[in-house]
Amino acid sequence: RAKGIFASLSPDEWEAASGCGGWRVQDVAQHMAAVFQQIAAPETIDVGDSGKSEMAAEVPVGARRDWTAEQVSAAYDEWSEKGVAALAALQEPPTADMVVPISDLGTHPLHILANAIVFDHYCHLRHDIGAAVERASILPRDPDALHATVEWMLAGLPQMCAAELGAGPDQ
């Protein structure tokens, strides 16, 4: 779906402000490509050393802000293919069940990383790019993608939002 949206974007749509504060649609697409690159070949991309996922996302986007839309689209095409292959390899035992820290997102079995990427894409396409490009906001709802997204949220929220969840509701 992302490749189809990216292929359909006009120059003005690539430059439009996205739903991610301070990022254009092109920056969101670059982030999506960079995430796949980080999974497939982490040694080839600088994401800083903050240990914070949001700060790590900004590093490659900032470094590539002057790229053309064609370069961003080509990077997404290349790295999404390699990233999906790497994620598929993480679904096989014993690797699938290996528990590792994922920056400030918590400690998770490697197989759930694919769910995190589905969540990331679901949100970025429909909400962030969708804020500027209506056809992205109305992409069909894929039950498998929704299942993977909810599974990631249920696995991640207790770790990512432990303080907020521990505080309980406001009285």
Regions found by a protein language model. Name each.
Residues 1-30, 40:
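An N-terminal domain-cap segment
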Residues 4, 41, 74, 78, ...:
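Charged/polar, solvent-exposed surface patches and flexible loops
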Residues 5, 35, 86, 124, ...:
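Short alpha-helical functional segments enriched in proximate histidine and acidic residues
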Residues 16, 44-50, 89-171:
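Structured surface interface patches that mediate subunit assembly and partner/cofactor docking
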Residues 24-25, 68, 109-110:
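Short, structural beta-strand-to-alpha-helix junction motif
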Residues 27-38, 82, 121-124, 128, ...:
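Alpha-helical scaffold segments in carbohydrate-active enzymes
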Residues 35-89, 93-98:
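Short, helix-capping/interhelical loops that line the mouth of catalytic, cofactor-
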